[in-house]
Amino acid sequence: MPTPDFILRLRKHVGHELLWLTGVTAVVVAESGEILLHRRADDGFWSTPGGILEPGEQPAAALVREVAEETGVDVAPERIASVVTEPPFTYGNGDRVQFMDVTFRCRPVGGSARPDEEESLEVGWFAPDRLPPMNERVMRRIAHAREEGPAYYAAP
């Protein structure tokens, strides 16, 4: 996945030090109940679409942009499903990051599911009982988005 320019500029000053970033995740649910997933080009795993906010960008706008870029599907955010701080992560090149992730439940409003081949190798709609293998973090986001009620957050 391409690294945003603002992060490349920051890395020139901070090297591999931990960066605190805001990310957004979309759990896109069709009328049929199927969930939109993409197989990531960077690690080959299935995941929900999403990405990093650009400086000054609103979370919902970043979400709409990222889903369209990665999957070709236009979405309308319906509600925030969860707000969580993920554990720190170190990339293969040594860069360290930690994300506050805002997960939105969305509905599709246009476009056509297709991989962009830069960030997504495959894109598809999956019944909730037929999801491909995914990590626990992604499964948790999907579960929160499918629940009714207030957004999930880690209680103090």
PLM features per residue range, with description:
Residues 53-77, 84-141, 155-156:
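Unchanged
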Residues 28-31, 106-108:
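Active-site beta-strand termini and strand-to-loop segments that position acidic
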Residues 21, 30, 41-43, 48, ...:
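Short connector loops at helix/strand junctions that flank enzyme active sites
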Residues 21-23, 32, 120:
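A structure-centric signal for secondary-structure junctions around beta-strands
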Residues 31, 80-83:
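Residue-level recognition of beta-strand microenvironments
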Residues 7-11, 144-156:
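Acidic/histidine-enriched, glycine/proline-rich intrinsically disordered or flexible terminal extensions
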Residues 30-70:
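Conserved Nudix-box catalytic region and its N-terminal flanking loop in Nudix hydrolases
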Residues 1-25:
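Acidic, metal-coordinating catalytic segment for phosphate/diphosphate chemistry
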